[in-house]
Amino acid sequence: MIKISKVDERIYGSFIEHLGRAVYDGLYQPGNPLSDDDGFRKDVIDLVKELDVPIIRYPGGNFVSNFFWEDSVGPVEERPARLELAWRSLEENKIGLNEFAKWTDKVNSNMMMAVNLGTRGIADACNLLEYCNHPGGTKYSDLRIKHGVKDPHNIKVWCLGNEMDGPWQLGHKTMEEYGRLAEETAKAMKLIDPSIELVSCGSSALDMPTFPKWESTTLESTYDYVDY
């Protein structure tokens, strides 16, 4: 066999979404005899470790376009419940950003974070990045420390929204709208942490009416600022 080059391990990544029993009663089930002290199912942890998944995206999926990350951090008993519009359910925020970061450590994987560019935007993405990656001494990094997470998560890979070409997506954008929003969000985020890698949304499927023009149009705006 001739070796051409090394395959980027991130090709074999995956994602988890607050959908059905994927999170609640799936990977997270406090009180179950199979769960650890943090409420995570040990049998699920063992199976995911066996898969050797190098990177896992959070929090989805269509879910991200209605995700308010601030609701998912801090004392669990103080977190609000919200109507979850993507899958028409109730999100109680019993597990959130910091818990998922802990879970990815347990399964020997890396966390990829998606930002909400559907119903939110640039400021929210920057605040989230500051919370996750900045060491301390600022509003949101100090908030993370207050929440019991002293060291930054140092999340390397960030997704700029999810399936923004799809009319099913909350905050669906035209290719021109998304290209400009992704460009400005990327520029701002890299001012906070130049080391991050950014992923823009491509076409959701080959049969989308905007494929492949979506790619060429959005890249006219984002090419100099995104990595994937």
What are these regions (language model features)?
Residues M1-P54:
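Mature N-terminal, pre-catalytic/accessory segment of carbohydrate-active enzymes
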Residues D8-Y12, D52-P54, V107-M111, D151-W158, ...:
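Short, well-ordered coil/turn segments that N-cap beta-strands
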Residues A22-P30, N62-L97, K102, K106, ...:
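Aromatic- and acidic-residue-enriched carbohydrate-binding clefts of CAZyme catalytic domains
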Residues S35-V48, G96, F211-Y228:
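Short, acidic/polar
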Residues D36-S65, G96-W103, V107:
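Catalytic domains of carbohydrate-active enzymes, especially glycoside hydrolases
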Residues V53-V76, N116-C132, A205-D207:
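Aromatic-lined carbohydrate-binding surfaces of glycoside hydrolases
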Residues T174-Y228:
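Noncatalytic carbohydrate-binding groove/subsite architecture in carbohydrate-active enzymes
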